[in-house]
Amino acid sequence: MAHMVGADDIESLRVELAEIGRSIRSSFRRHTSSFRSSSSIYEVENDGDVNDHDAEYALQWAEIERLPTVKRMRSTLLDDGDESMTEKGRRVVDVTKLGAVERHLMIEKLIKHIENDNLKLLKKIRRRIDRVGMELPTIEVRYESLKVVAECEVVEGKALPTLWNTAKRVLSELVKLTGAKTHEAKINIINDVNGIIKPGRLTLLLGPPSCGKTTLLKALSGNLENNLKCSGEISYNGHRLDEFVPQKTSAYISQYDLHIAEMTVRETVDFSARCQGVGSRTDIMMEVSKREKEKGIIPDTEVDAYMKAISVEGLQRSLQTDYILKILGLDICAEILIGDVMRRGISGGQKKRLTTAEMIVGPTKALFMDEITNGLDSSTAFQIVKSLQQFAHISSATVLVSLLQPAPESYDLFDDIMLMAKGRIVYHGPRGEVLNFFEDCGFRCPERKGVADFLQEVISKKDQAQYWWHEDLPYSFVSVEMLSKKFKDLSIGKKIEDTLSKPYDRSKSHKDALSFSVYSLPNWELFIACISREYLLMKRNYFVYIFKTAQLVMAAFITMTVFIRTRMGIDIIHGNSYMSALFFALIILLVDGFPELSMTAQRLAVFYKQKQLCFYPAWAYAIPATVLKVPLSFFESLVWTCLSYYVIGYTPEASRFFKQFILLFAVHFTSISMFRCLAAIFQTVVASITAGSFGILFTFVFAGFVIPPPSMPAWLKWGFWANPLSYGEIGLSVNEFLAPRWNQMQPNNFTLGRTILQTRGMDYNGYMYWVSLCALLGFTVLFNIIFTLALTFLKSPTSSRAMISQDKLSELQGTEKSTEDSSVRKKTTDSPVKTEEEDKMVLPFKPLTVTFQDLNYFVDMPVEMRDQGYDQKKLQLLSDITGAFRPGILTALMGVSGAGKTTLLDVLAGRKTSGYIEGDIRISGFPKVQETFARVSGYCEQTDIHSPNITVEESVIYSAWLRLAPEIDATTKTKFVKQVLETIELDEIKDSLVGVTGVSGLSTEQRKRLTIAVELVANPSIIFMDEPTTGLDARAAAIVMRAVKNVADTGRTIVCTIHQPSIDIFEAFDELVLLKRGGRMIYTGPLGQHSRHIIEYFESVPEIPKIKDNHNPATWMLDVSSQSVEIELGVDFAKIYHDSALYKRNSELVKQLSQPDSGSSDIQFKRTFAQSWWGQFKSILWKMNLSYWRSPSYNLMRMMHTLVSSLIFGALFWKQGQNLDTQQSMFTVFGAIYGLVLFLGINNCASALQYFETERNVMYRERFAGMYSATAYALGQVVTEIPYIFIQAAEFVIVTYPMIGFYPSAYKVFWSLYSMFCSLLTFNYLAMFLVSITPNFMVAAILQSLFYVGFNLFSGFLIPQTQVPGWWIWLYYLTPTSWTLNGFISSQYGDIHEEINVFGQSTTVARFLKDYFGFHHDLLAVTAVVQIAFPIALASMFAFFVGKLNFQRR
């Protein structure tokens, strides 16, 4: 039940939990007393010494000083007394044995008020170090003539990864191997920059998107991708990057949040702290302690305890973790799982802070931080930047931070500003000089304009003109190149060049400043850390392993009841059945390891991040992943053997039972190792699954069962001996058929067992069992070595080599410079006119009011909270919310993280899929009806979910086609789409592919603007926007808000949640709704001129500090209404609002607006959706076709798989199609078709799961928006598959038919094509069906293997229809593969009446098919109908369940 609760929703409860924890502290009196100050006993002077009269304390400290060095470094004195106790004192504690409660209380005592107490703690530490005359290590980072270049492939037309473009690229790569050259271009990302980042100063990196900020941060921290070429020199304290380990010396904090979803926040940071080690803290602590002892100084107990606790290496739980979580505000969610797209966890803002916490918990002294405050409210962002400022100033750290929208208060905390644009540095110097520099260039920052916003806009072509302040001089655009040159001529720029011209004096560098060792811990400790984490993840994924075991039990039950001993005789015919049962066991255990592919591939992104940051070597990750799978593999193999051995009726000897079990265990563990190895090599889920399918195909076809080794072409027999499954087959066969009960002599003078082995080409002696076992162990070792080597030497799977269109290249290279001036003049002239033009293009809509009264929202109490003592059944997340949103009024919905902003929007928009809603919601006075409300409303979600394989323009067109009223003609729609693209400034990237978040395609801010455009183009009357400016820089945010304001001015109702508004953006809103933690309202009303009303309201509360001049009202408002202020002043802002005259006025307004206007009518539409069903289907089919055409990883890979598989089978079964003389030759041909049908289908199903799940997430958003019906979506998805499936089926027939040598008849060729086409359709539609009934890819991937058990066992090959027990015959007829093989074999051989020798008797081919397999040539028409019925049935179930089930938890 815990997964049903949103992270934002329950964050407030975490705070309450913390408060309750503090209130019941008396129950932990012993722990509490350990940390209370006893000022009556002693006082600490300014220098930290203790008064002379505290003799007892001095004696206790002397005891510690006499301890051995190691023990002394781990021992300290902590207060041991309570204010209520008459006797007080201290006790000696071991800092390595602090419990969770002790660590929590210690941090709570050290840091009550984060901003002030963190500063005090850092000052105390610095004072202690300075007092003994020590210097802290510092790092000065220099970069000279730094240039970063990307090599791109130039293509004609749009640079989109279509199947055709990808095929051409593959061919061009092959051509390059011959020495030929392709058309390439080099694009400068960073262009010849110089600079110095000094220690002890906090530097802000500003610049528009795509200006090179991230690349610069990565280059300076030594984390640049290999596909980028870097020249110039970067040095730390005079040392080049290749002279030390920059990844250990500095920390790069990415803008992307990559974490393991199954771990909690605390576990993630603890693991990071453990792997990063303590750096020089131990040496510093020992030296400080030594010098204090020499000088007779007794330190402050709190500081000593803290410094010693964070100086101990390798602890599983670190006090530093508690400290970092506290200062970043993550302590309230420390025990919550991180979660992912489909699994509830912490909020986006908390995830962003966790990314920062993961790195700063380490000992590094240089931080390069990329957009660390995205998604955070301005108050939290200020607090984090303030902590960084304190860290930089007091610890003399080197900190460079990239921010998108820093509030003025946060901006003022920085010492230096670095402004970038187009890969150049426009300014790098003191913050106080930057405005003077631009004023000298002719530009002035207006009053009440944030300086950071001004800096990002003044370098933009479209915004620069408004800041020109020379009224007597004409304005002309000042380019980035000109600004950069002016800066170099400035005294600050010249000073940088002068400093760089003199080499850094290395003798000044502290010995501990740079890290020269790659890893922080000894190998054994790294191994223990990694194996502990791997064990934790296995426990968290227990459901997967239980599900797999249950599935194995089910498969074993089916197998043993099919091959049950009562039906199995000791003869040559049933010997074939025993052989089938053994082979099936091998296949089951082989395929059981298949989920290891996706589980390994999904974690590789986090692994490569941590490997890049030198957390641990690859072997420390690989060995635990291998070792911990041994008991699982052992258990699953034992379960299978115990269930099946005696029921099937294998030889009843204990030794042979255990030998079969040991061999099956070796096969199972080898398969797990093989799939893990393939995942490490191919890295992505889709590519790994394709490779895994090839792996299964290879092991299956060369195992010696489908085609005996003697029948294989001589040049392919190596495949048999290079195959792990072959050794499993040999070992199991000799173990069973060399048993005494198979020793009956046959007419050929061989025993029955030998005869069976000979027919299968397995005539080996008993020693081959041990050879096979050793071979399997060898394969296991080999696969795990390759797994480790792949992790060690392969790089992170980045997006493929960049492609660029010729037009875009020309633009970047400046071939259009001649038109630049005229273009600029035109754009600057057009800018103010644009709004009027937009106003003319207002599509018809009906203004609507949203009112809500006494709105409450509850969810079921999470299980973990019940475990902590909460006995309530429900958890309240919104409490008595009353308000109204009116047409033409732009409303801001604000509050700290966890206040319930998104929850309120979700409830009003009808997006909640769980929980309980109370209260009254009305639209223009009428009760809200969700079906009609979806038609008139738009919702910009916080997570930007879009189809990755279509362009920006196509995404907007698609939304317009499906959501605009059908009365609007196509020309108007096209014009409106163009206008929306221009308004949101997406017109310049309209041909760019959307891509996958954090991997390829659009940047974060471009993706955010696309989300807004997709909703605006629907022309809704009501628009809800959840953090529309998060992830945007100040200029992009201003563009978006300007567009939103223009839309609101047309009479629409718009509500935006917003986190970090600048003054301009905040004051663009007309009204404000402010929530506090717990979902309670503390203000609703107008903002007023310069936010006058909101300021007056809060300043009227006694003891609230007045707002400072030019202070951001949004930040001030959040600060003065915070929970800490409420506690400090003893007030409840929700109660103050409830008792105010403003509340009474608002209540009256809501009552008034809740009544419909006279003569008005409720919203009604002739149909549920804007478009007819046919219109929906056409639009969906259009998008799906584009998406498929641009998905080479899915479509091209499966076509290649089909081609290669067909070639392998064709070569292996060369000309066997008409070579029929014995039953074995018939089995061989049957095996070829059986193998191809099964494995082409399995590959299609497995590779389709990931693709369909991605599209399903998009579908959830589009369905919520009321864009189309489930049946239209399902049919569009189903129909799009058909041409690609047909191509695969055609490949199969064209390649295999002549190679295997089937009968050359058009009739038989058609049947082959038809059978394979229906089979592949069935497998693909099965993938759709599985995705529609499962919550995530992992469960679907496991569930699919259960279907494969039936598809394999009941296909008619392993056990023919005539031998299937009566209680299972129904499953045979429900198995699609049985009908596929029936259709193929019957059509091919059902009319062949040649003589064939079957088990020593003569019969015809047609009679053998009928008597042994149950295939009737005269029933082919029935077979044809059943074959097409399977895909139709699965497609219908997909359409049904995709409409009925919703696994998105909100």
Curated annotation (Swiss-Prot):
It comes from the Eukaryota. ATP 2 binds at G895, V896, S897, G898, A899, G900, K901, T902. Expressed in roots and, to a lower extent, in seedlings. ATP 1 binds at G207, P208, P209, S210, C211, G212, K213, T214. InterPro entries: AAA+_ATPase, ABC2_TM, ABC_transporter-like_ATP-bd, ABCG_dom, ABCG_PDR_1, ABCG_PDR_2, P-loop_NTPase, PDR_assoc. It is found in: Cell membrane. The chain crosses the membrane at residues 544-564, 581-601, 615-635, 661-681, 687-707, 773-793, 1194-1214, 1226-1246, 1282-1302, 1313-1333, 1339-1359, 1365-1385, 1422-1442. Residues 525-737, 1175-1389 form the ABC transmembrane type-2 domain. GO terms for molecular function: ABC-type transporter activity; ATP binding; ATP hydrolysis activity; auxin efflux transmembrane transporter activity; efflux transmembrane transporter activity. It is a multi-pass membrane protein. It holds the Pfam family PDR_assoc. Induction: Induced by cycloheximide (CHX) and cold/dark treatment. Up-regulated in response to iron (Fe) deficiency. Residues 175-447, 850-1103 form the ABC transporter domain. Disruption phenotype: Defects in efflux of the auxin precursor indole-3-butyric acid (IBA) associated with developmental defects such as abnormally long root hairs and increased lateral root production. Strongly reduced coumarin (e.g. highly oxygenated compounds scopoletin, dihydroxyscopoletin, esculetin, fraxin, fraxetin and esculin) exudation in the rhizosphere, especially in iron (Fe) deficient conditions. Hypersensitivity to iron (Fe) deficiency. Residues 817-838 have a biased composition (Basic and acidic residues). Belongs to the ABC transporter superfamily. ABCG family. PDR (TC 3.A.1.205) subfamily. This is ABC transporter G family member 37.
